[in-house]
Amino acid sequence: MRGKCALLYHCCTMRVVYVLLLGEMSGMSFEIGLAQTVHPKDGDVVGMVKRYAEQARMYGVDLLVFPEALMTPFEKTPEEYRAIAEPVGGAFSQAIAEYAKRYGIWILYTMLEEAPEGKQPYNTAVLVDDKGKIQTTYRKTHLFDTDTIQESERITPGENLHIPTATPFGKIGIGICYDLRFPELARNAALEGCDVMIYTAAWLDGPRKADHWKSLLRARAIENEFFVVGLSRCDSGYLGRSLIVNPFGEVIEETGPIMDLVVATIDLEEVAEARAAMPVLDHVRNDLY
């Protein structure tokens, strides 16, 4: 049986949505929290992370996810990006690692990672465990160069796909925003054993943007028969509307364009159930493509 019940919690800083997905819970489930944020007016991003971590711990979250462009707004010059960037493990990373350890939760966040001298920084996702130890990083590989924005003016692209990371709650795959439009990244993660694919994003609002966001997230879940999580920031001009899709392509939680902490129970047995019913990955023709 698949379904849900919801408890809404309102406070002055954020709205918390708690969703329980009904089914057989046998140690294969975990709590995921999506921190749909805006940049704080006072610029205290670390303080904001602390507040979300405190709330997440109250709701028993195992993995707390923050959106793309957490460290600083996108709307800065290339020179400002280079000045803000830090190495992974620098002061920004250390502060978040401390909160992960203090509240006993895993945290996935993004930062501007220093690149070799003369290069623009990387747009990097970092996964830190509940002991404050960095378990994996991923540098965004597909940069958003379009008719209106040239991300490559600010960011250096990564050169490697993310290999799903083993955690106490399954193998976690990571993509960043525009990566969602490239199904090869998700398929590679699936073939590497991914259970939950997380896209952390600053998805722009505008014509067709919401439809593309939802359709692409559902498609990635259906194609690969794993959970897909899409988290977008919700500042002015950005979409918000974060959602979670199960391995059958069903949207099991979706929020609006406001600050939220969405907490959901993900049952990994649904991955095995979907793949047993229709073993798509077993039918991939690697000899042809």
Give the positions of each predicted feature.
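Cationic, low-complexity basic patches in intrinsically disordered or flexible, solvent-exposed regions
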Residues: 5
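Active-site catalytic loop in hydrolytic enzyme cores
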Residues: 116-192, 205-215, 219, 277-280
